[in-house]
Amino acid sequence: MRVENNNVSGQNLDPEQIDLIDLLVQLWRGKMTIIISVIVAIVLAIGYLVVAKEKWTSTAIVTQPDVGQIAGYNNAINVIYGSAAPKVSEIQSILIGRFSTTFSALAETLDNQEEPEKLTIEPTVKNQSLPLAVSYVGQSPEAAQKQLAQYIQQVDDQVNDELEKDLKDNIALRMKNLQDSLKTQEVVAQEQKELRIRQIQEALQYANQAQVTKPQIQQTQDVTQDTMFLLGSDALESMVKHEASRPLVFSSTYYQTRQNLLDIESLKVDDLDIHAYRYVMKPTLPIRRDSPKKAITLILAVLLGGMVGAGIVLGRNALRNYNAK
């Protein structure tokens, strides 16, 4: 009874188990094909690793410039605009904004080249405008770090040149406005002087007609245009000569305008050293390569080679079985 049960048990093996064992047997018999396939895949992977361009990413973090970095620019703005000049914090925001815009434009230009270069700028913290992370992908760690530093400096120099040009244009416009204001005030002062002389001459004419030669009043501060002739012709003639030789009289606004003009003329824009950013972290020297990944590439090569080899073995055996039938 025990022998019969064993026979029955052996005859009732699971067909799926038999198929799996048969599959493993086929793969084992064709192991040389699989090994050769894996070796070929590894060789191809090594060839790819040798030929493929390496990618290394250097990153830097920048933020708005310090007050000391824009001291000269801030002083020039204050001289030009006076009380209407923007605050230091506003200037800092403007400068880093121009840096970001110019950097983005450069990144777009590099991306559209015949051989594109990957340069990026983005906030380091989501929903916060500052600080900014800038990065560059190069073919070696040193090249990526060096090129990123050069592009940052290039953008900073470009912003500096643009700001200096804007300052020169604003200075020229402001000087013209101040000069026009001075001319207007000088014309008004000259007209006031001429009016004063005509008034005295008219009073002198009345005094001569009334034959008033000596002052007829004691309190000169009470004299009006209608009563000026009472000062007498002698005094009025002296007043005419005095007013004619007297320099123009200007208000304090005139002298303040002139002082502003002199201050602006003394500005030396070319000597300003304007920086639109400040480093939070200088360009890094990358220690991990972005691509190609050696370990991952070789592992994938082994897996792919094994799969191809197994496919060849199973396909060949299936074709033999089909032909045998």
UniProtKB/Swiss-Prot annotation:
Compartments where located: Cell inner membrane
Cytoplasmic side: 1-31, 316-325
Residue ranges crossing the lipid bilayer per the database entry: 32-52, 295-315
InterPro entries: Bact_polysacc_biosynth/exp, LPS_length_determ_N_term
GO CC entries: plasma membrane
GO biological process: lipopolysaccharide biosynthetic process
NCBIfam families given in the database record: PRK15471.1
Full protein name: Chain length determinant protein
Organism: Escherichia coli
Gene: wzzB
